[in-house]
């Protein structure tokens, strides 16, 4: 007798659940995606005990016909595809027919649904995947699915469930991503009877960003657009000053589906270039529309991994769109705003999921470029004397931070600074800026980008240049400023100019592992672009007999090792990236440092040269070169002007 048997359907569904239903958030994702596919305009999600006791999803979608309700719990039963050709033109979020039977096999499920064409609805009750009740129900609009006692029959799965707060954070993250993917749908997330999140469903993505991350974040987001023959890109990206220490705040959407893609993440960072600090990541919401034939979503049961055709072309489109958007505006960060932001970060609570995120009454007016409050919201606030402030919604990835507070009269506007690139001061021949480079060849600042006309005042701590304009006080980091100037020179000149060499009295030896020695021996000509000439010497060794004059002798060993790391660190070598990294290092090593006194003429020359840069606002490593204190900021610090003490409700009326 043969040993191979066909597993019964209940056992097969439990095995499939191991891939599809990893945690309560997985159930929420699958059920809400079904509601989206059903054409719902309003979806309510109720959870208790972080989804372990109850997950309830209610929508106003098309609903199921009576004969389809029981069939929906059969494996690979779906209305989304009909034949193999449909696999290559998938436009829905679900299509595998695995979610409902997998969820039902590890829970107690109730489905209440009705279709517009039928006179009555249908109610189904299943336990462990086995249907116990199938009966008529009073007609309702859409579908309500309740999942109770998740993993009740697979206790081993409960062992690996983290804290309720952590599981709730995962659920919140899922709803955040789906809300960003579908701003045209109103999402409501309720935990233990408390409303966590509510979006308006009016199609305004920027308002959804404000509802999830707060108005302060939405104020610093810029719209991006781009398209070619295959892709259409829309969305928002944050200004370089708004960053986080991880990629969790980047949302990439393909045809309304949230995906994870390392290469597209890298394209976003390449679009920012050196505007970002090392190890910092922006906020971004990118929605990409693509012909379904160019995207294969049938890769993983969770459908978050997608294989893309023409991925390189899409990366180029993303990088270009972000770079063009950020190049259009003035990127000088407000000094006081940054200090206040750091203070808030220090006061952040890691987990605070019990705080409800209240309904956001704001809407964003694209014509007036501002947030405003609806009349009904003002009416509700005026009824409640205690409503003196608006709590912003600050739901984040895996943590829920303390909510920010702020008046809705604060506007989301781009700061404009009257500026000029004209400096009338002459530069002395021996000034710090004349270090043997012809800066007349540096490209002028784009007309779309502006730099303030600065009057030099003094040097602070031999490190910062104090300047003023009619817009207020400016602080310029002298090292970052000259690093930017030199970087923009070297990035175009690396490999094209001969560099003077200084003979070393005692040569340097560099010993490498064998595998690295082989790679570097093949690519050591790349070091010639920086004026570094290594020769093979002995077993797994290179010798350096001379060095370029731009490289100080005390920094030779460290700098050469950094160059070698640049070459060896990337499996997919990019000459463009190598030249960028090399130019950034050369610029940094050869620039004036902190605690270096400058005379007034040298300082003015440095400011003049900074104003001619393509991107004068940050150094090659993403640190700001200049910060701004507005006149109002200074007067507030000395309390020469005061904040008004009228209620927020009064100020809202002014902005109707």
UniProtKB/Swiss-Prot annotation:
UniProt record, GO biological process: mismatch repair
Record's keyword annotation contains Metal-binding: no
Alphabetic keyword roster: DNA damage, DNA repair
A GO MF label: mismatched DNA binding
Stretches with biased composition (Polar residues): 387-408
Sequence similarity: Belongs to the DNA mismatch repair MutL/HexB family.
HAMAP family: DNA_mis_repair
Described purpose of this protein according to its UniProt entry: This protein is involved in the repair of mismatches in DNA. It is required for dam-dependent methyl-directed DNA mismatch repair. May act as a 'molecular matchmaker', a protein that promotes the formation of a stable complex between two or more DNA-binding proteins in an ATP-dependent manner without itself being part of a final effector complex.
Protein name: DNA mismatch repair protein MutL
Organism (species): Lactococcus lactis subsp. cremoris (strain MG1363)
């Amino acid at each position: 007798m043969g040993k191979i048997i066909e597993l019964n359907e209940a056992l097969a569904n439990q095995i499939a659940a191991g891939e599809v239903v990893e945690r309560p958030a997985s159930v929420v994702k699958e059920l809400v995606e079904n509601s989206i596919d059903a054409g719902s305009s309003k979806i309510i999600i109720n959870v208790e005990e972080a989804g372990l006791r109850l997950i309830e999803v209610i929508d106003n979608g098309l609903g199921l016909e009576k004969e389809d309700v029981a069939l929906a719990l059969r494996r690979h039963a779906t209305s989304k595809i009909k034949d193999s050709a449909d696999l290559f033109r998938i436009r829905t979020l679900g299509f595998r027919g695995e979610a409902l039977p997998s969820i039902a096999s590890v829970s107690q499920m109730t489905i209440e649904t009705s279709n517009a064409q039928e006179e009555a609805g249908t109610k189904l009750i299943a336990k462990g995947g086995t249907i116990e009740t199938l009966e008529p129900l009073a007609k309702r609009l859409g579908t309500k699915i309740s999942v109770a006692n998740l993993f009740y029959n697979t206790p081993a799965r409960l062992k690996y469930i983290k804290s309720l707060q952590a599981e709730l954070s995962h659920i919140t993250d899922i709803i955040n991503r789906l809300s960003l993917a579908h701003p045209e749908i109103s999402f409501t997330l309720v935990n233990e009877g408390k409303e966590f999140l509510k979006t308006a469903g009016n199609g305004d993505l920027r308002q959804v960003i404000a509802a999830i991350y707060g108005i302060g974040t939405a104020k610093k987001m810029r719209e991006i657009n781009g398209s070619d023959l295959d892709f259409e890109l829309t969305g928002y990206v944050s200004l370089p000053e708004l960053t986080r220490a991880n990629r969790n705040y980047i949302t990439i959407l393909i045809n309304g589906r949230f995906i994870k893609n390392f290469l597209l993440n890298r394209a976003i960072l390449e679009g920012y270039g050196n505007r970002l600090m090392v190890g910092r990541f922006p906020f971004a919401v990118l929605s990409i529309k693509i012909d379904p034939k160019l995207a294969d979503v049938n890769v993983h049961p969770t459908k978050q991994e997608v294989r893309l055709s023409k991925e390189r072309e899409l990366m180029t489109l993303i990088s270009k769109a972000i770079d063009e958007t950020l190049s259009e505006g003035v990127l000088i960060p407000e000094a006081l705003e940054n200090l206040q932001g750091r203070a808030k970060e220090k006061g952040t609570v890691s987990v605070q999921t019990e705080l409800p995120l209240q309904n956001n009454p704001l809407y964003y007016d694209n014509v007036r470029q501002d947030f405003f409050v609806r009349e009904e919201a003002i009416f509700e606030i005026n009824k409640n004397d205690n409503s003196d402030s608006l709590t912003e919604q600050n739901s984040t990835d895996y943590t829920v931070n303390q909510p920010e507070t702020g008046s809705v009269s604060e506007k989301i506007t781009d700061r404009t600074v009257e500026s000029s690139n004209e400096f009338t001061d002459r530069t002395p021949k021996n000034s710090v800026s004349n270090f043997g480079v012809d800066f007349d060849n540096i490209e002028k600042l784009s007309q779309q980008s502006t730099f303030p006309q600065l009057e030099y005042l003094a040097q602070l701590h031999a490190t910062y240049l104090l300047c003023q304009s009619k817009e207020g006080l400016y602080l310029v980091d002298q090292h970052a400023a000259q690093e930017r100037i030199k970087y923009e020179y070297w990035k175009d000149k690396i490999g094209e100019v001969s560099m003077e060499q200084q003979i070393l009295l005692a040569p340097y030896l560099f010993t490498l592992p064998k595998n690295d020695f082989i790679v570097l021996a093949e690519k050591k000509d790349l070091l010639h672009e920086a004026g570094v000439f290594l020769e093979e010497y002995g077993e797994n060794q290179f010798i350096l007999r001379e060095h370029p004059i731009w490289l100080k002798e005390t920094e030779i060993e460290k700098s050469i090792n950094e160059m070698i790391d640049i070459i060896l660190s990337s499996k997919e070598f990019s000459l463009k990236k190598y030249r960028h990294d090399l130019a950034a290092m050369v610029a940094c090593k050869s620039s004036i440092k902190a605690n270096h006194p400058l005379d007034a003429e040298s300082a003015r020359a440095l400011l003049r040269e900074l104003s001619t840069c393509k991107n004068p606002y940050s150094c090659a490593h993403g640190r700001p070169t200049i910060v701004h204190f507005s006149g109002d900021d200074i007067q507030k610090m000395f309390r020469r002007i005061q904040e008004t003490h009228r209620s927020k409700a009064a100020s809202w009326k002014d902005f109707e």
